[in-house]
Every structure is written in structure tokens, then in C-alpha cells.
Amino acid sequence: MPLATPKMFLALGLAAMTAVLSGCNTYKPAPKAFQQATIQPYTLDSGDRLRITVFDQPSMTNSYTVDQAGYIAFPLVGQVPARGRTLQQLSGQLAGKLRQGYLRDPDVTIDVDRYRSIFVMGEVGQPGQYAYVPGLTVQNAIAVAGGYTSRANQASVDVTRKINGQVITGRVNISSAIIAGDTIYVRERLF
């Protein structure tokens, strides 16, 4: 049996390196629905605080938070489902419920008083939970979280987002827009 030669060691080393590195890119680019979620009308979820105004009804005008079950508790009508609805849909739903024996022609407007949080994890200076503001990008969120560590992969990040009730993770570049509720994970670079 021939002894191992330097060429054989080189070939085995390259084969092992190829096998190891082929597992490094297990994420696919974000699906189309992932990107489209950033341009769709905002949908409500747990943690959103809403400013609801009922014209000429100061006792009903107040701030209401979407609870963990996805509902708001509104005077006279009780629990109203809010999760997955746009502001316009919820406004119409509340007006409809108020019309059923409470008010003749209710005028309901809704604004987001405070969006649900985003989370920034991984190779950033201060991982944690942060307030979302409309127009926030991955790069802005990383800056708010103390910037990159020296080990961070600065080319792209993994964002986990709930779309149509499903939790999806996609790899995006740092100029990508984010939405309320996103979790951003900055990976460690290989070299």
C-alpha cells in the first residue's frame, strides 16, 4: 500500500474544506412574499398600541393595546379582533359594532400610537428589544443596537418575520426595509 503523499493530503484537505463550506450557505434568499410584506398596508398584531378616536364621543376616545390574543377591549362592544387587520379594516369593524344599537353614524379613526417592538440579536453591540418606527431599515436597526461587533458579517443578515400567520426567515441585505415585529439576527463572519 502506497504511503500518503503531499498531493493526497492536499486533495483530502480540499475535499473536507468543500464539505464544510457547502453547509455555510443553508439559507436561501428571502421569498417574494417576504419583500412584499414591507410595502403592504400595516397589519395589527399583539403589542401595538392604538389611538382610537370616535368623533363626538370623548368617553370612547383613548389608547388601546392589542393584547396577546390579538384583541382590543373597546367600551360598549367588548373584545374586538384586531390581529391581521389594517387600521382601515378595524375602523370599519368598530363603526359597524357601534352602529348596532349604540351610535347612529359613528365616525371612527385609528392611528398607531406605538408599534410593536423589533428585536436585534447576534453580533451587535447591544442585542435586545427596540422600538419600531416606520421607514426603519436593517442598517438603522443595527445602528440603534450599538452597531456591529468586530466579528459581525456585515454583508447580509437573517430577518424573521410573521407573514399571513407563518413565521418565515430570510436572508436580506442591510438596506432592506423592516416591519414591526421583525427579529434581526446578525451572523458571525467565518474569517
Residue ranges and their predicted role:
Residues 2-6, 10-13, 21-191:
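Ser/Thr/Pro/Gly-biased, low-complexity, turn-/loop-rich segments
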